[in-house]
Each structure stands twice: as structure tokens, then as C-alpha cells.
Amino acid sequence: DANIIATAEADGTNNAYDLDKMIPYLSNCDMVVGTRQVQIFTQKGNQNSIMHVWGNYWLAKLIQFKYFSLHHFGIINLTDVGCLFRVIKKESLEKLTDKFIDHKTGDAIGGPAFPLYLTMRSIEKDLRIVEVPLTFNKRLGQSKTRSDEKISGIKYGLIFLKFILRY
């Protein structure tokens, strides 16, 4: 029975000590989302190619535009849509858990679109979100999704784009 829930990739790309950086923000917000876009925190040779960095950035800005507000240049400032490393308050997650269903198709939300869904649904529920830079290491082992390959990466980018536009 925890008050804070953390999610992360299971491929060694995240460092648990970044939780010490993330958790204090929960005194001012509901969810802290990581970004892998700050170069000084990324290990050389990781899977974030130029395509991944810029694709994530532009998709993040599309979400910002979708939920734009004139206050503080928007509701959220994002640079990375695909980072699953995040922490959320238990009571905030409870506002979302009954809705892990695509409201258009009725299908459960999972897979690569899950981080997008968490972010977008949180915005719609008026949860306060902040993004913080995290350490990003080289992946241990092979990618199960093959998203580090150019064609697969483009396919994932198009899946993300479609999800953002239709959700």
C-alpha cells in the first residue's frame, strides 16, 4: 500500500537514484515525468538517435499545442513523449485507473502509447505535471520492439502521432 507509484523501463536505461530527484516535486504536482533529452545526462551510445530526439520533441510540442493555455505558455512543458520513467501520487493515479480504456475503440491502453495516454489523460483530469531531466543509459540487451531501427522507429512515431491526434 504505497502513496507514490513509479514506472520505468525494464531495460536498464533508467537509474533508480533519479527517484531522489523526482519525488520532491510531488509536493507541488501530481505526476513527475522524465525526459531523456538533456545531453549531459545521456550515456554515449544509447538508442536515442537524432530521429528519436527530434521525433519525441515535436510530438511533445504537439501535445502542448493540443492542450494549450495562455497561462504560463501552456498547461505543460514537454520535450519527451516516450519516457515511461515517472512517479505519480497514489490518489492521482486512482483518478486515472478506471479509464485505461480508449474512449473511441473501447480497447485497453497499453504498449507504446501508454506513456502518451498517462500524460494526456492526466492533463484532461487537471492533474499537475512537471517534466525533469533524467539519466539515460544504453539499453541492456536487444530491443523487443525494434524501435531503435529506423523503419520501426518511424512506425512508432506514426503510432504516437495518430494517438495524439485522435485521442
Outline where the language-model segments fall.
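Short beta-strand-to-loop acidic/aromatic patch adjacent to the donor-nucleotide binding site
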Residues: A2-T13
